């Protein structure tokens, strides 16, 4: 089975014939099997999932697929065992045939914070960079996005997307295992581009912003969420080592500095529409994500600081327009 057969016609319809042909090669099942050692186990777990038609679907207020009564002879414990093969579940939550997948992040909280501030997604073609398992993409489809393409380099997250896709069977939402650096330059074909929780992992944040800009059509909107620090236009924090135990955190700008970066990259209509300090309610370890989480990243005696003594995670959502 090729999980991406429905993707290529979508790209061709967007004028991206060359990219579609390239992806047909890079996303071949054989190549993915060679690249990822856990791929056979995930494929087996995916194929072992029960073939059930969900009696109900809600993507507008949550991501809810079916109800417990749809399971029939299959027990919820059996389904949980199959789903746990895709541990760790970081983005969600999901409700799948009555099984509540309590993920590390309450991604629905971020969605609720940003939705009132962005251009309506109905009828739009959307790119979601670093999309994880596609949770926000399902919510985008729930509010009427015409097509959502998520890119995510971590294959376990892509396989979690395929779990949901097995039951939703939505050709208008695709998640592919590539990074932003693998995107062709200057696609200029998406109406909205999301980059949430990616910028601070990039060694060159301005190059990342320009890559995102190149994906947008003129008049398209960028929605960018990143870690920030307090300060003026000249304030940018670069951790001397780890930040919240993460080794790959590079630049945390202030709101004025981030605004300046977007201006220098050629964006207009720039606004910071939300700031939020990450709480234990929003990010925590669960039975579905049993590794360390926020509680382990903060100073136990002073939660305004990370374990290294840096300012605790503060996130901001920016919107901007490609002229």
UniProtKB/Swiss-Prot annotation:
It catalyses: carboxy-S-adenosyl-L-methionine + 5-hydroxyuridine(34) in tRNA = 5-carboxymethoxyuridine(34) in tRNA + S-adenosyl-L-homocysteine + H(+). CDD domains: AdoMet_MTases (cd02440). Its EC number is 2.5.1.-. GO terms for biological process: tRNA wobble uridine modification. It holds the Pfam family Methyltransf_9. Keywords: Transferase, tRNA processing. It comes from the Bacteria. InterPro entries: CmoB, Mo5U34_MeTrfas-like, SAM-dependent_MTases_sf. Catalyzes carboxymethyl transfer from carboxy-S-adenosyl-L-methionine (Cx-SAM) to 5-hydroxyuridine (ho5U) to form 5-carboxymethoxyuridine (cmo5U) at position 34 in tRNAs. Homotetramer. Belongs to the class I-like SAM-binding methyltransferase superfamily. CmoB family. This is tRNA U34 carboxymethyltransferase. The gene is cmoB.
